[in-house]
Amino acid sequence: MGQRRENALAVYADDGEKFGGWPKTFKHVYEDGWLENFFSTLQAQGDWLKLITFSEAVERFSPRGKIYLPDASYREMMEWALPVKGIFQYEEVSHALGGQPWAHLARRFIKGGCWRNFRVKYPEAYQMYARMLEVSKKIASLDRNSEIFLPAEKELHKAQCNDAYWHGIFGGLYLPHLRTAIFRHLLTAETLADSHPKTYLETLDYDLDTKKEVKISNPMINAYFKPERGGHLYELDYKP
């Protein structure tokens, strides 16, 4: 890499959960010495490979140009983001492509779906996302010097843990205890940030569908209703 291009820069990042969070990874990474061996191997290449941080790279190297990064993830994730019918069509195209001599040129243009489509494909994900934005706006309106700002913001950040808003091979959106944890932190953050009287009623577009919903809130509960669905109660929160 260093010989092909002057000042070549490779960026390495990996999931923190792979470093002791996943089953058996603690033993593999720490006790069996994978992490120490990994860094020792990198250091042994010091005559041509220099290890630097992200901030050091920004300071030392000028940008080579401008790019716009799309929302993206690994290949399987982009496939799962598609509607169910689209997944079958994507697989059909991928299999047909596999036997073509120019397949390696076409792969970059066949990326699957839009990662944000998880919020459309799964109503549970969109509901969490909309509630998160509602709570985020409340916290953003707080005085940053107030005593409640940092505790409320911390709870919001916990509620923004991304794993529950999508799914992979295992874990994610379809595990109810993860969604429960998101809502628990959202309710805690909202309770800290709510500047309304103890009991109030509001009509706003809470779930971002361009139609107004009705929210009734008191110290014990939040109740969300959809008038256009005959007063459907679509969310009932029990506050901590």
Regions found by a protein language model. Give the residues of each.
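Active-site and substrate-binding clefts of carbohydrate-active enzymes
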Residues: 2-230, 238-240
